[in-house]
Amino acid sequence: MRYLTAGESHGPGLTTIIEGLPAGMPLLAEDVNKELKRRQGGHGRGARMRIEKDQVQITAGIRHGKTLGAPVAMFVENKDWKHWETVMSIEPVPEKNEKSRRVSRPRPGHADLVGGMKYGHNDMRNVLERSSARETTVRVAAGAVAKKLLHELGIEVAGHVLEIGGTRANLTRDYAVAEIQETSEASPVRCLDGVAAEEMMQKIDDAKKNGDTIGGIVEVVVGGVPAGLGSYVQWDKKLDAKIARAIVSINAFKGAEFGVGFEAARKPGSEVMDEILWSKEDGYTRRTNNLGGFEGGMTNGMPIVVRGVMKPIPTLYKPLQSVDIDSKETFNASVERSDSCAVPAASVVAEAVVAWEVAVAVLEKFDGDRFDTLKKHVEEHRNLTKEF
């Protein structure tokens, strides 16, 4: 299973095409729209989210509420397009309009300058329109489809914010997926710790007042995962590696870790490895989950626990120093409309990309042509691993 996305931040809209879904899987536009709505929320979002009311148009691959096994095409309209029709026109425009909203002063930390160099664009709007996090709208749409597939197989995904601007949630126990879903949805910053959430919101407000931005850390937990997804036999078949790539591919994300993550480097092996248990009711489990549900690049049946770190958004309302590519003189960087903090929204994007990789791994391991046989094979596999 794979997908491609297309579209610019201020173009007519965004498109994704998914190939490889099994036939007969229940899927409605509402399954996607509820995830799009979640992405648009969160304390710290900018004015753009007051304009856009993202709704998906499914234009292919589904009939009467079920997938056909053919490619699924989805489109999300950019309502702000009406203000950008000349600037972002697909057709040629009069010469006097060609330089409207031209960007010649790249923003530090963004794709502007290097993208312009790479593709030979003397207007870096050609770069920023595609490199914008607006593209994650359709990544969330694709992830919503993956989450629906996983849900039907008894696999659930939840994300939450662990840290913003140096304020970290004080979590003294592990949370079940359903509990994460319920608690995070009730928080303006998608945080499980109410006290920390208040401090996070204050830091976001302070950053906005100062024309600055702040980043943070998000965590995604996947429960009900069968053992044996991914493989140890080749480096590129390891599922944790694929998830790490997916996390770091999200705009502004700079790293990923599983389980205790980098803390494992500071502990002896006896405090890191998860002891193996067995019971007739549950089969093989682990006493702890320090490795985040992975051993040898494969799921071990414990919940997947992965975290991603997001840098502050590069667009600053008090811009840093840059250089004009025309004159080579020093100027302040360009300013585009942006958020002061998008970490809460990014947790929804992280859910989407993790769900996608897990869904792909499920379809790689089991028959993926028909959804009814897929469900049967997953259940058979669960029983086999329990009895091993």
UniProtKB/Swiss-Prot annotation:
Gene3D superfamilies: Chorismate synthase AroC (3.60.150.10)
Family per record: Belongs to the chorismate synthase family.
GO cellular component: cytosol
Pfam families for the chain: Chorismate_synt (PF01264)
Protein name, entry field: Chorismate synthase
Cofactor notes: Reduced FMN (FMNH(2)).
Binding residue positions for FMN: 130-132, 251-252, 296, 311-315, 337
Oligomer status and interactors: Homotetramer.
CDD domains (UniProt xref): Chorismate_synthase
Region annotation Disordered: where it falls in the sequence: 95-118
Domain of life: Bacteria
Residues annotated for NADP(+) binding in this entry: 39, 45
Catalyzed chemical reaction(s): 5-O-(1-carboxyvinyl)-3-phosphoshikimate = chorismate + phosphate
PROSITE patterns: CHORISMATE_SYNTHASE_1, CHORISMATE_SYNTHASE_2, CHORISMATE_SYNTHASE_3
Recorded name of the encoding gene: aroC
Pathway it works in: Metabolic intermediate biosynthesis; chorismate biosynthesis; chorismate from D-erythrose 4-phosphate and phosphoenolpyruvate: step 7/7
Record-level Gene Ontology MF annotations: chorismate synthase activity; FMN binding
InterPro entries: Chorismate_synth (IPR000453), Chorismate_synth_AroC_sf (IPR035904), Chorismate_synthase_CS (IPR020541)
Biological processes, Gene Ontology terms: amino acid biosynthetic process; aromatic amino acid family biosynthetic process; chorismate biosynthetic process
UniProt keyword list: Amino-acid biosynthesis, Aromatic amino acid biosynthesis, FAD, Flavoprotein, FMN, Lyase, NADP
Enzyme Commission no: 4.2.3.5
Cofactors demanded by this protein: FMNH2
